[in-house]
Amino acid sequence: MQNETASHGINFDALGRDRQSLDLASESVELEVPGLNLFYGAKQALFDVRMNIPKQRVTAFIGPSGCGKSTLLRCFNRMNDLVDGCRVEGEIRLDGHNIFAKGVDVAELRRRVGMVFQKPNPFPKSIYENVVYGLRIQGINKKRVLDEAVEWALKGAALWEEVKDRLHESALGLSGGQQQRLVIARTIAVEPEVLLLDEPCSALDPISTLKIEELIYELKSKFTIVIVTHNMQQAARVSDYTAFMYMGKLIEFGDTDTLFTNPAKKQTEDYITGRYG
């Protein structure tokens, strides 16, 4: 399969990342999924998903619309709890602890596992207050602590130099790409362990998309990142590992280079080469 899939021009080195040899089996595990099923009412949406998400790596979920990739992503911080009729069977373990166990503090889980959505969603507040929002909820109000957190998070989101002189202006005045980086700053300000990105570039122009992709590459030194994307070129550029999903099932999961150039499953090859999807 190698020649055919490689001929589709997937560019693995657009970000200049280190193409080191990766071995999923030897990675430290951040999120463990030993068997997960999910139902919306009587309809099953995820079927016995089993995977380990490696620590401080970028894992991409790809697959056609409706394949379950965003549904699975939202399981990792229990956002599906907010969907009427949604029911989960099985476990997801964060640092060895089942996030669906009784007594789990869901608010604390969502601090540890932050999420950025498709459309930038800054609050109608100042740039500064957007970044410190989660910290204030935690009862942190000392100005020095907040000031340091704002600078750290905005630098981490590659936005500090663009906004440092207008921190108290409305976040709604930022461009779409800047707003998305602000949302990332707001998410990392509470120092999560995992960042979930649900098609974070789908509403952005190519220049803003490149900035987000470069940011993802920088952030993985501090955070475990899981990204859902419809853009296979993007998955190839930013991720270390890629999972291909189809009709609620995990078809193939492995290092990105191998999955795109020499997939093990015919379904994966068909999707990558554009035969369906």
Swiss-Prot record:
Swiss-Prot/TrEMBL GO biological process terms: phosphate ion transmembrane transport
Residues noted as binding ATP in the record, renumbered to the chain: G63, P64, S65, G66, C67, G68, K69, S70
EC number of this enzyme: 7.3.2.1
Cellular location(s): Cell inner membrane
GO CC annotation: plasma membrane
Broad EC category: translocase
UniProt keywords, alphabetically: ATP-binding, Cell inner membrane, Cell membrane, Membrane, Nucleotide-binding, Phosphate transport, Translocase, Transport
InterPro entries (alphabetical): AAA+_ATPase, ABC_transporter-like_ATP-bd, ABC_transporter-like_CS, P-loop_NTPase, PstB-like
UniProt domain ABC transporter: residue ranges: 31-272
Membrane topology: Peripheral membrane protein
Major subcellular location class: membrane
Record's catalysed reaction(s): phosphate(out) + ATP + H2O = ADP + 2 phosphate(in) + H(+)
SMART domains, A to Z: AAA
Record GO terms (molecular function): ATP binding; ATP hydrolysis activity; ATPase-coupled phosphate ion transmembrane transporter activity
Subunit field text: The complex is composed of two ATP-binding proteins (PstB), two transmembrane proteins (PstC and PstA) (Potential). PstS is missing in this species.
Function: Part of the ABC transporter complex PstSACB involved in phosphate import. Responsible for energy coupling to the transport system.
Family: Belongs to the ABC transporter superfamily. Phosphate importer (TC 3.A.1.7) family.
Protein name, entry field: Phosphate import ATP-binding protein PstB
Source organism (scientific name): Pseudomonas aeruginosa (strain ATCC 15692 / DSM 22644 / CIP 104116 / JCM 14847 / LMG 12228 / 1C / PRS 101 / PAO1)
